[in-house]
Amino acid sequence: MKRQKRDHTSRAFTRGYQAGVEGRSRSLCPHSTGEIKQSWLTGWREGREDHWNGFNTLAQVQRISNIS
């Protein structure tokens, strides 16, 4: 059975979350405008917050799988 691709907004959120957790700058957002950029930035903000709150790698992986 074929798996459906996730929509672009959830993929952008996940990528933004990963960037935030890794401590990268939000200026590295690959999207220029629109809903996809907002999703990436929202993920980035949540990732930075989790990074600051001291989530370990396992907790971050669990959070990403719960979001997706």
From Swiss-Prot:
GO terms for biological process: regulation of translation. Gene3D superfamilies: ribosome modulation factor like domain. InterPro entries: Ribosome_modulation_factor (IPR007040), RMF_sf (IPR023200). It is found in: Cytoplasm. Keywords: Cytoplasm, Translation regulation. Pfam families: RMF. One of its GO terms (cellular component) is cytoplasm. It comes from the Bacteria. During stationary phase, converts 70S ribosomes to an inactive dimeric form (100S ribosomes). HAMAP family: RMF. Belongs to the ribosome modulation factor family. This is Ribosome modulation factor.
